[in-house]
């Protein structure tokens, strides 16, 4: 398969400074979730800036969609339409007096018709969960909301690739979770997502591929398990081993077996513990709890309220920007808003019933993830879809 982006033997140095990039070669495939991970000064941001032509390397070639980048104005304009860049500080990127005008900036400059601009802005704000924010001045927004405006401004141009430099910087934990959940949602819709970060706890469970950088060089590229299992490379990159991987290594050093792949979630750690107890751990005497899934575009708030009033539900989880907006509008306070599926699986293993609110293809993702877990671990956790106006007598039942 032809790479979406290919870098070959890149070299780059800022004026009067040591090399920022040295001998960089990299292929990026469509649909990947990639995290460039390294300490400050490792070259992450510089490398990201080469991916859509904002920096022209001193040596080497950048190939996008199979063609070498020529760096003329028209070529760069087309590239930046399809490969969007979100800066670390959204205040650098947000320039218009209202949210609508800022998100419309790209489509207007791409000569969209008035109708196309309206549709592009509407779709972008819907994607990031900022419907109703059109007339707000950006300086009245929170840090997380500004990040979403910056992302919406890129999405309005319908890019194939979304590049984000330190996407969770300056955000509190809840804001960080919201942004990473949004990136998961966009990737599920087909976008290629590339981020930079020094936060190994963020990158390890999220990325499909980790690229470790140190002093302008790529020192490792592989799955999160591969990249972070090499303690010497992690040390060279001035990083630390992710806590779940470190815990797994400590358990193994004490004689515990770690079947299958290395753990990337709490659910994986539970699997290791159960395996070493030969399946003797019983998390619940009442069997498995049921995971119910509701598509907020197909059911109403009154329907959900009626269900919760008549039945027992231990946990409410929301996945995706649209679902979070609906939950707020419906007066629901979710228990879980990040890593929702795995956390609801844990609840089900403990005999508790969960309700996941989400939209579209994310519904399918819930069923696929639970099915995969059941097959891999010889489980039979039930998943049910809430359909139309049907109100089950008991959510906890199968």
From Swiss-Prot:
InterPro entries cross-referenced by the UniProt entry: AAA+_ATPase (IPR003593), ABC_transporter-like_ATP-bd (IPR003439), ABC_transporter-like_CS (IPR017871), ABC_transpr_CbiO/EcfA_su (IPR015856), Co_trans_ATP-bd (IPR005876), ECF_ABC_transporter_ATP-bd (IPR050095), P-loop_NTPase (IPR027417)
Domain ABC transporter: 5-240
Pfam families, sorted: ABC_tran
EC number: 7.-.-.-
Compartment(s) of residence: Cell membrane
CDD domains the record matches: ABC_cobalt_CbiO_domain1
Ligand binding (ATP): 38-45
A biological-process GO annotation: cobalt ion transport
Family note: Belongs to the ABC transporter superfamily. Energy-coupling factor EcfA family.
Subunit structure, as described in the record: Forms a stable energy-coupling factor (ECF) transporter complex composed of 2 membrane-embedded substrate-binding proteins (S component), 2 ATP-binding proteins (A component) and 2 transmembrane proteins (T component).
Functional summary from the UniProt entry: ATP-binding (A) component of a common energy-coupling factor (ECF) ABC-transporter complex. Unlike classic ABC transporters this ECF transporter provides the energy necessary to transport a number of different substrates.
Listed PANTHER family: ENERGY-COUPLING FACTOR TRANSPORTER ATP-BINDING PROTEIN ECFA1, HEAVY METAL TRANSPORTER
Protein name: Energy-coupling factor transporter ATP-binding protein EcfA2
Origin species: Methanospirillum hungatei JF-1 (strain ATCC 27890 / DSM 864 / NBRC 100397 / JF-1)
